[in-house]
């Protein structure tokens, strides 16, 4: 800094030079998305799973660590499970993948076989579910958020564990920075014999002439699942912050070992499924005017599952059988039961920020599920072609007071359901 006295017609020329200042460090403080969710108005746990993505644990085991959440699995890899949130379970809990119903990926895709290395965090809502998810869940929801990094990466994991269990996960992304175009392939494969030993099973002892309890190995519980997905899109354009198209295919094969109770043993019955899905998503901030954000989703799924029960046999835990005149599962005639369930999902969401502390959100979700049932060999089975369509409209007002120390959400939802049922037989007979 220098002071110069200019008098009269004296002419002075000034040349400015850049003065660079070197800083030791720059600290930027802010709250992560997970922390913001935990401090919001909803009862929600946000799990950061980055440290667990390349372990042998599946998502159901990771979610089971959360307070108030309990998962009970019926067996090993690929077995059915029941998730409860604060005591609520079953259909009162819904599952989402980036805000899209997980069912849209197909009936074979669950928490048990979704590849962990595509996940950024998991949001677990306990009780009240935000209107923007567009669901009729009463007990809570699990929303799985995938990795949205705008950079190139490659993540490959392979694990081998007990009972001939193999898991392979591949996740990659290539981004062309100049154009904003990206491609993200995902591939996952899981297989297991699930031939672990079960204690206290009832078997007939010929020498003693009575039933005794022994430890036996499971012999008909193989599991195989495959998931392949390709996502292609573009980011940071004038007409869209993000637009992408996703195509996926999934397949599962599951042998059935037991019925509702452990003493009922199967040796031939199995369940299969395969599904194809195509979807498109669109996001744009400041859509028409400033502070109006919009995102949309459109998805269609071809879902097919089949239960094969054609053996007239009765098995025991010694892997021996006697011939009978009934199948294993229902005790009826031979059956190859097919279920074709096409699903259409469409969602539109508008979010408008009135200011830094007040915002309004409007959400519409359309979810249509078909259910066509038929049997290849059981001629007495009554075919059906049922339809369930849901329209869910949600309006919410978000309020932030006292410098973020108090958060309020006021919302209302409207449910419009359409149901067409042609089924004529009892559900316990037809499935």
Protein language model features and the residues they cover:
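Face-selective signature of the C-terminal outer-membrane beta-barrel domain
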Residues: 231-252, 271-431
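Extracytoplasmic beta-strand/coil segments of soluble accessory domains associated
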Residues: 44, 60-101
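N-terminal periplasmic accessory domains that precede
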Residues: 11-15, 59-62, 79-84, 96, ...
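Predominantly transmembrane beta-strands of Gram-negative outer membrane beta-barrel pores used
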Residues: 94, 125, 141-147, 153-161, ...
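Extracytoplasmic loops and strand-loop junctions of Gram-negative outer membrane beta-barrel proteins
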Residues: 105, 124-125, 152-155, 209-216, ...
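Short acidic/polar hinge/loop motifs at secondary-structure boundaries
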Residues: 100-127
């Amino acid at each position: 800094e220098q002071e110069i006295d200019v008098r009269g017609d004296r002419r002075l020329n000034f040349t400015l030079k850049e003065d660079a200042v070197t800083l030791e460090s720059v600290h930027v403080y802010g709250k992560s998305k997970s922390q913001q969710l935990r401090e919001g108005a909803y009862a929600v746990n946000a799990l950061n799973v980055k440290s667990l993505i390349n372990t042998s644990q599946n998502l159901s085991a990771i979610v089971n660590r959360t307070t108030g959440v309990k998962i009970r699995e019926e067996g090993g890899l690929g077995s059915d499970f029941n998730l409860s949130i604060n005591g609520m379970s079953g259909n009162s809990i819904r599952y989402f993948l980036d805000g899209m119903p997980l069912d849209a990926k197909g009936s074979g895709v669950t928490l048990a076989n979704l590849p962990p290395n595509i996940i950024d965090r998991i949001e677990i809502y306990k009780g009240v579910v935000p209107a923007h998810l567009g669901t009729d869940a009463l007990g809570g929801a699990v929303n799985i958020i995938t990795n949205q990094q705008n950079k190139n990466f490659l993540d490959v994991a392979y694990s081998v564990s007990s009972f001939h269990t193999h898991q392979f996960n591949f996740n990659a992304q290539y981004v062309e920075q100049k154009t904003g175009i990206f491609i993200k392939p995902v591939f996952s494969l899981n297989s297991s014999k699930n031939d672990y030993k079960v204690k206290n099973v009832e078997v007939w002892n010929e020498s003693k002439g009575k039933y005794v309890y022994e430890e036996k190995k499971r012999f008909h519980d193989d599991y195989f699942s495959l998931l392949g997905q390709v996502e292609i899109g573009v980011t940071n354009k004038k007409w869209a912050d993000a637009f992408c198209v996703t195509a996926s295919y999934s397949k599962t094969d599951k042998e059935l070992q037991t019925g509702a109770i452990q003493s009922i043993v199967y040796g031939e019955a199995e369940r299969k499924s395969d599904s194809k899905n195509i979807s498109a998503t669109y996001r744009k901030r400041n859509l028409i005017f400033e502070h109006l954000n919009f995102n949309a989703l459109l998805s269609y799924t071809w879902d097919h599952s089949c239960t094969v029960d054609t053996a007239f046999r009765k098995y025991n835990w010694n892997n021996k059988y006697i011939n009978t005149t009934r199948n294993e599962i229902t005790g009826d005639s031979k059956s190859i039961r097919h279920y074709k369930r096409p699903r259409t999902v469409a969602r539109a969401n508008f979010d408008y920020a009135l200011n830094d502390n007040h915002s309004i959100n409007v959400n519409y979700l359309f979810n249509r599920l078909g259910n066509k049932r038929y049997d290849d060999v059981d001629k007495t089975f009554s075919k059906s072609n049922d339809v369930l369509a849901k329209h869910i409209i949600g309006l919410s007002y978000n309020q932030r007071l006292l410098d973020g120390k108090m958060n309020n959400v006021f919302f209302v939802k409207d449910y419009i359901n359409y149901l067409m049922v042609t089924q004529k037989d009892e559900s316990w007979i037809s499935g």
